[in-house]
């Protein structure tokens, strides 16, 4: 599912909301999660999961085309850990359509 599909599904389930308003809400939520992560904060959505940032150490990588070794700088990467309720629902097939 892509963001536009998510927006459409939410709008379909909430006919009292305009599509453009749902899109603004979804964008605002994603922006706030991104801002929190960029500050190094953890974002927890109970029953769904938690977003956090992990640091990857600098390392020596390899160019897959040439095989040459290349230095890869230290970087921050987003990390998502599913919540217990989400895992249970997925394992029960609850979300299958």
From Swiss-Prot:
It comes from Beijerinckia indica subsp. indica (strain ATCC 9039 / DSM 1715 / NCIMB 8712). One of its GO terms (cellular component) is cytosol. The keyword Membrane does not apply. One of its GO terms (biological process) is DNA recombination. The keyword Plastid does not apply. This protein is one of the two subunits of integration host factor, a specific DNA-binding protein that functions in genetic recombination as well as in transcriptional and translational control. This is Integration host factor subunit beta. One of its GO terms (molecular function) is DNA binding. Keywords: DNA recombination, DNA-binding, Transcription, Transcription regulation, Translation regulation. Belongs to the bacterial histone-like protein family. The lineage of its organism: Bacteria, Pseudomonadati, Pseudomonadota, Alphaproteobacteria, Hyphomicrobiales. Heterodimer of an alpha and a beta chain. InterPro entries: Hist_DNA-bd (IPR000119), Histone-like_DNA-bd_CS (IPR020816), IHF-like_DNA-bd_dom_sf (IPR010992), IHF_beta (IPR005685). Gene3D superfamilies: IHF-like DNA-binding proteins. Pfam families: Bac_DNA_binding (PF00216).
């Amino acid at each position: 599912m892509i963001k536009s599909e998510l927006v459409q599904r939410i709008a379909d389930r909430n006919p009292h909301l305009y599509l453009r308003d749902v899109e603004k809400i979804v964008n605002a939520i994603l922006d706030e999660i991104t801002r929190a992560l960029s500050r190094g904060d953890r974002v927890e959505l109970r029953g769904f999961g938690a977003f956090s940032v992990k640091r990857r150490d600098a390392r020596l990588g390899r160019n897959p085309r040439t095989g040459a070794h290349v230095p890869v700088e230290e970087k921050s990467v987003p990390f998502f850990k599913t919540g217990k309720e989400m895992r249970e629902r997925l394992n029960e097939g609850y979300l299958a359509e």
